[in-house]
């Protein structure tokens, strides 16, 4: 079974995939937002390519656990993504995922300039790995 991780941003959407048996998430691609219908179609194409059976959307909570506008955006997007993919979609707390993604990219020697195109997919991998780790026995 494979799971798709989604880091939903206002400009870009990061995507990652995990094999639940291997329990490791990896960044796959970044979708530049062009409108919800096109965004959903692009995500669905990746989901089909990787034969995912579930998706996890990052829920950007504030540090105190409250929800702001970005969290409401994710909550609204999740059911539409579920309908587009035809697989269950869960929300998962993504606090500090972008910070962790930037840190991982820096550790691999990716320059700040080059991170812009990779940080969203890496953040999706951070979100998805956190979800996998939380489900570990």
UniProtKB/Swiss-Prot annotation:
Q: InterPro entries under this entry? A: RNaseH-like_sf, YqgF, YqgF/RNaseH-like_dom, YqgF/RNaseH-like_dom_sf
Q: Give the EC number(s) listed in the UniProt record.
A: 3.1.-.-
Q: Which UniProt keywords apply?
A: Cytoplasm, Hydrolase, Nuclease, Ribosome biogenesis
So which domain of life are we looking at?
A: Bacteria
- Give the record's GO biological process terms: rRNA 5'-end processing
The GO terms describing molecular function are:
nuclease activity
Organism classification:
Bacteria, Pseudomonadati, Myxococcota, Myxococcia, Myxococcales
- Which CDD domains would you find in this protein's record? YqgF
Question: Mainly localized where?
Answer: cytoplasm
Pfam family for this entry, one: RuvX
Gene Ontology terms: cellular component: cytosol
For this entry, the protein name equals: Putative pre-16S rRNA nuclease
* Family of this protein: Belongs to the YqgF nuclease family.
> Gene3D superfamilies per the record?
YqgF/RNase H-like domain (3.30.420.140)
Keyword Ribosomal protein listed? The answer is no
The record's listing under SUPFAM superfamilies reads: Ribonuclease H-like
Its function?
Answer: Could be a nuclease involved in processing of the 5'-end of pre-16S rRNA.
Give the location in the cell.
Cytoplasm
């Amino acid at each position: 079974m494979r799971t798709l991780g989604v880091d939903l941003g206002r400009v870009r959407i990061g995507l990652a995939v995990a094999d639940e048996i291997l329990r490791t998430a990896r960044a796959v691609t970044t979708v530049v937002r062009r409108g919800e219908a096109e965004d959903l179609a692009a995500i669905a194409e990746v989901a089909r390519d990787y034969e995912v059976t579930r998706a996890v959307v990052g829920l950007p909570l504030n540090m105190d656990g409250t929800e702001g506008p970005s969290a409401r955006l994710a909550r609204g997007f999740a059911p539409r993504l579920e309908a587009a993919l035809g697989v269950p979609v869960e929300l998962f707390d993504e606090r500090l995922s972008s910070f962790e993604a930037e840190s991982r990219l820096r550790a691999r020697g990716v320059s700040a300039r080059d991170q812009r195109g990779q940080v969203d997919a890496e953040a999706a991998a951070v979100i998805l790995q956190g979800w996998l780790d939380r489900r570990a026995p």
